Amino acid sequence: MRIGVLTAGGDCPGLNAVIRSVVHRAVDNYGDEVIGFEDGYAGLLDGRYRALDLNAVSGILARGGTILGSSRLERDRLREACENAGDMIQNFGIDALIPIGGEGTLTAARMLSDAGLPVVGVPKTIDNDISSTDRTFGFDTAVGVATEAMDRLKTTAESHQRVMVVEVMGRHAGWIALESGMAAGAHGICLPERPFDPADLVKMVEERFSRGKKFAVVCVAEGAHPAEGSMDYGKGAIDKFGHERFQGIGTALAFELERRLGKEAKPVILGHVQRGGVPTAYDRVLATRFGWHAVEAAHRGDFGRMTALRGTDVVMVPLAEAVTELKTVPKDRMDEAESVF
């Protein structure tokens, strides 16, 4: 069997662990040939790929990013790929394609599968927002990075009696903000799933200061937004990939809190530091398991599906099921977090 693998969309820790696992399982166990398309679906369309053998994946388990490169594909080019799916199978001689990516990548994978490509998807995203899987690799690392940042910021906030507003990633799902905020003991958490009122945060800070706790840390997801009429804040434009560009809720909220409280409030935007660096042990293991099961699925002819974690088991689920809707933070998880503010 000849297997093609690619990484697309935003990078995250653990991608190389999947690539390594695919190569080891395919080559060692089945004697397969594995090729890696460069820069995601763009490499698939442009015919840019390289052979992946055991030497090519040596030493990459703990490396962040992706040795294959990644990119986002514009919608016109995706349509082009679907229209030429049959030609791509013939030109590259691939018997299976394993795209590793988030919601956008898996949506494209579903379209390519519907067009006739033998596809087995592997979900990744630091946002943990893909339906049908309990966890995605990359998420654990991102939560750890955000938690450590807030742990560090608490000391400087306390020293200067400041309010620190820490903005983390999460356009439409607030999983990183929820879990890192809980782990770091943030005093307020703002999620995309529930509009917030700055007045509640002002009250929280004032109550803390009245008890002699003269600092506060607020964790806010980039997609969080204030309740209508509670503060001035505008949403951003849509980029060419269909993603909303946010205007910086962390900065806007810090300004609003400083204005209302008369106390110094500092925004800290973690940004892409959450995507980089060494993956945690958990993410390495999950990514490795996903790669193993993707190869097994390909050899069973179990196409049009993706790997997923259910409890402690890795199972295969239809791509259509995985991309129907985003997995957002449910009310009970928000209530749990609020109980320890």
Swiss-Prot record:
Source taxonomy: Bacteria, Bacillati, Actinomycetota, Actinomycetes, Kitasatosporales
Disruption phenotype annotation: Accumulates glucose 6-phosphate and fructose 6-phosphate. Has an increased carbon flux through the pentose phosphate pathway, resulting in a higher production of the pigmented antibiotics actinorhodin and undecylprodigiosin.
EC number(s) stated in the UniProt entry for this protein: 2.7.1.11
Temperature-related activity annotation: Optimum temperature is 30-50 degrees Celsius.
Keywords attached to this entry: ATP-binding, Cytoplasm, Glycolysis, Kinase, Magnesium, Metal-binding, Nucleotide-binding, Transferase
Gene: pfkA2
Function per UniProt: Catalyzes the phosphorylation of D-fructose 6-phosphate to fructose 1,6-bisphosphate by ATP, the first committing step of glycolysis.
Source species of the chain: Streptomyces coelicolor (strain ATCC BAA-471 / A3(2) / M145)
UniProt-annotated binding residues for ATP: 10, 72-73, 102-105
A single GO cellular-component term on record: 6-phosphofructokinase complex
Principal subcellular localization: cytoplasm
Cofactor(s) demanded: Mg(2+)
Enzyme class, spelled out: transferase
Subcellular location: Cytoplasm
Pathway(s) served: Carbohydrate degradation; glycolysis; D-glyceraldehyde 3-phosphate and glycerone phosphate from D-glucose: step 3/4
One Pfam family cited in the UniProt record for this chain: PFK
PANTHER family associated with the record: ATP-DEPENDENT 6-PHOSPHOFRUCTOKINASE 3, PHOSPHOFRUCTOKINASE
Assembly with partners or alone: Homodimer or homotetramer.
SUPFAM superfamilies: Phosphofructokinase
Site positions (Important for substrate specificity): 104
Annotated GO biological process: canonical glycolysis; fructose 1,6-bisphosphate metabolic process; fructose 6-phosphate metabolic process
Gene3D superfamilies linked to this entry: 3.40.50.450, Phosphofructokinase domain
Protein name: ATP-dependent 6-phosphofructokinase 2
Activity across pH: Optimum pH is 7.5-8.
Family under the similarity heading: Belongs to the phosphofructokinase type A (PFKA) family. Mixed-substrate PFK group III subfamily.
Catalyzed chemical reaction(s): beta-D-fructose 6-phosphate + ATP = beta-D-fructose 1,6-bisphosphate + ADP + H(+)
